[in-house]
Amino acid sequence: ITRLAEECNKWNLPLIVEPTTWGSKLTAEKKRDVSLYADMARIAGEMGADMVKCDYMGTPEEYQAVVDNCPVPVAILGGAKAEAAQVAKTIEDALSCGVCGVVFGRNVWQSADPAATVKGLQALTYHGDRDTFLKLCK
């Protein structure tokens, strides 16, 4: 990460790091351990990431440790395609503990209208407008 951060700095490119728990060495329970993500986010920031993209899990009170522990902004990833109401709750919970935003893929690309979904994400993330989000993200 540090070498890549140095290269990104040369070209004035931001480095977004996504710490992962892929692989078979961790139990399913450990892969959902908020304290592990808090440590991974901190390490990514210390190694030169400009932003960290993490899975959201637990409660806002638990996830606060990820945001507080990380020296750079934290955004949440979208994960698997989900129902709009669940996505809205996840975003609202994450924003309540200080994440800087969302970095979504499948919930945009797999929607019926990706452009409308992006507008809905903007409405919810920037303005707290859940109704517009739910209307646009059917």
Residue spans of the language-model regions?
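Alpha/beta enzyme core
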Residues: 1-74, 82-100, 104, 123, ...
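Surface-exposed loop/turn and secondary-structure junction residues enriched for glycine/proline
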Residues: 23, 111-112
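Cofactor-binding loop segments of dinucleotide-utilizing enzymes, especially the Rossmann-like FAD-
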Residues: 79
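Histidine/acidic-residue-rich catalytic or RNA/ligand-binding cores of hydrolases
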Residues: 87-88, 112-121
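A short, acidic, flexible beta-alpha connecting loop/helix-capping segment that sits on the rim
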Residues: 106-110
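Flexible C-terminal active-site loop/helix
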Residues: 117, 135-138
